[in-house]
Amino acid sequence: SPESIHKFIDKIGYTTYDALNEFALLESAVREDLNDRATRVSAVLNPVKLIITNYPEGQVEEMEAVNNPEHPEEGNHVIEFSRELWMERDDFMEDAPKKYFRMTPGQEVRLKNAYIVKCTGCKKNDAGEITEVYCEYDPDTKSGLPGANRKVKGTIHWVSCAHCLEAEVRLYDRLWKVENPRDELAAIREAKNCDALTAMKEMINPDSLNVLPCCYIEKYAAGMQPLSYLQFQRIGYFNVDKDSTPEKMVFNRTVGLKDVWGKINK
């Protein structure tokens, strides 16, 4: 957003000389701004089906989801809950280590805005890939009921298989895999005696764009206008691309919730 650029400039100050600032400062300013203005929605980027085996077939419940916890006056919206859900594949591990607090056999997790469930197993195809995850829910733990206060360490997001939209998600990341492209460019050209274009290609981050064609997002996002600011819960900040259509929505990642590059470079 324009406001996040202003925040970034305020953070680094105004100078009259050529200065190099860490990219993380810009990302921090963007996160700070979008945390205040982005509408929260649930989206599943790497889906696997979650089946609640003891939930009544055909039953649908309307759960309340907060639009923006930073601004309660913006109200809530409805997200449908049913027996079959999409969850993130990365939120399940069949043989999990001791401090793994997401979905794994024998362990409870909270489905955000819904119930506490206990994983009972999974199904695999002939190649050994997990195609379905199974769990059972506790009907006394619905959000807002006294039973929902039971302590559970993990919370995961989800969307209902029958009440979501298919979407394309474009994961943009840093263009360069080096922190100082200008100095690195000169060093590569000198070391390899090559032209600038060849040297630049060596610095390009191969993961600067990943397109995920088959993601799922809750129906509430269908009413969002192009360039609307969203937070995909537990994932990052996104906006609605101008290529979006009612039949196939398209979202672009602005920045993740956390500084992944900072961890990689430590």
Regions found by a protein language model. Give the residues of each.
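Polyanion-binding catalytic cores of nucleic-acid enzymes and NTP/SAM-utilizing transferases
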Residues: S1-K266
